[in-house]
Curated annotation (Swiss-Prot):
Protein's name in the database: Membrane-associated progesterone receptor component 1
UniProt-annotated location(s): Microsome membrane; Smooth endoplasmic reticulum membrane; Mitochondrion outer membrane; Secreted
UniProt free text on domains: The cytochrome b5 heme-binding domain lacks the conserved iron-binding His residues at positions 106 and 130.
Gene3D superfamilies: Cytochrome b5-like heme/steroid binding domain
Membrane topology of the entry: Single-pass membrane protein
Modified residue annotations for Phosphothreonine: T73
Length: 194
C-alpha cells in the first residue's frame, strides 16, 4: 500500500523515506539562510543589553567630590573648562553651576563645550554657540529682549534642577559671599538629588 501512495503522489521514494524535516532544512539554501538568521537573533536576545567593550564607560573619570560653595570672577571661572581642571563649571544668569556630570555635552569635545568655564547666559539666550558671542568680562545682559530673557530663565530653571549650584558670578569690584560649610542655597531643596 505504501508503494501505491508514493506512486499516486508522484514523489521520489528517497525523499519520503529518509531525513524528513532535517533533510529538507539542510538541502535548501533558503532554509539554511533562515536557520542562520534565527540562530543569530536568538543569540542577540539571549545576550541581551550587555554593552560591547567599546561602549563601556571605563574611560570616564571617577566622580569628583562636591565643590564647596564659593563665588567666581569671570577670570576665575575660565580655569574650570574641563581641560585646565577636570571640573566643568558654567555661569547662567549670574549663577555658577557644576556641570561636570554632563561632560559629554559641556566638556571640550561636547556640543556645548564653548560654554565650559564661561558665562553661557548670552549664548543660551540667543541660541548662539559661537565663542564670539561670549564676553570675557561680566555681562549684565541688559540688552537682551524679553523673549531672550525668558529663554535664559528657562535655561536657569533647567540647570537649577539638574546641576549643583556652586556659587555666583561676581561683577567687577563685587566682594564674594562667605558661605558656611553647612549652608545650602534655598533652591537646592527643590533640586533633584545627584
Amino acid at each position: 500500500m505504501a508503494a501505491e501512495d508514493v506512486a499516486a503522489t508522484g514523489a521520489d521514494p528517497s525523499e519520503l523515506e529518509g531525513g524528513g524535516l532535517l533533510h529538507e532544512i539542510f538541502t535548501s539554501p533558503l532554509n539554511l539562510l533562515l536557520l542562520g538568521l534565527c540562530i543569530f537573533l536568538l543569540y542577540k536576545i539571549v545576550r541581551g543589553d550587555q554593552p560591547a567593550a567599546s561602549d563601556s564607560d571605563d574611560d570616564e573619570p571617577p566622580p569628583l567630590p562636591r565643590l564647596k560653595r564659593r563665588d567666581f570672577t569671570p577670570a576665575e571661572l575660565r580655569r574650570f573648562d574641563g581641560v585646565q581642571d577636570p571640573r566643568i563649571l558654567m555661569a547662567i544668569n549670574g549663577k555658577v553651576f557644576d556641570v561636570t556630570k554632563g561632560r559629554k555635552f559641556y566638556g571640550p569635545e561636547g556640543p556645548y563645550g564653548v560654554f565650559a568655564g564661561r558665562d553661557a547666559s548670552r549664548g543660551l539666550a540667543t541660541f548662539c554657540l559661537d565663542k564670539e558671542a561670549l564676553k570675557d568680562e561680566y555681562d549684565d545682559l541688559s540688552d537682551l529682549t524679553p523673549a531672550q530673557q525668558e529663554t535664559l530663565n528657562d535655561w536657569d530653571s533647567q540647570f537649577t534642577f539638574k546641576y549643583h549650584h556652586v556659587g555666583k558670578l561676581l561683577k567687577e569690584g563685587e566682594e564674594p559671599t562667605v558661605y558656611s560649610d553647612e549652608e545650602e542655597p534655598k533652591d537646592e531643596s527643590a533640586r533633584k538629588n545627584d
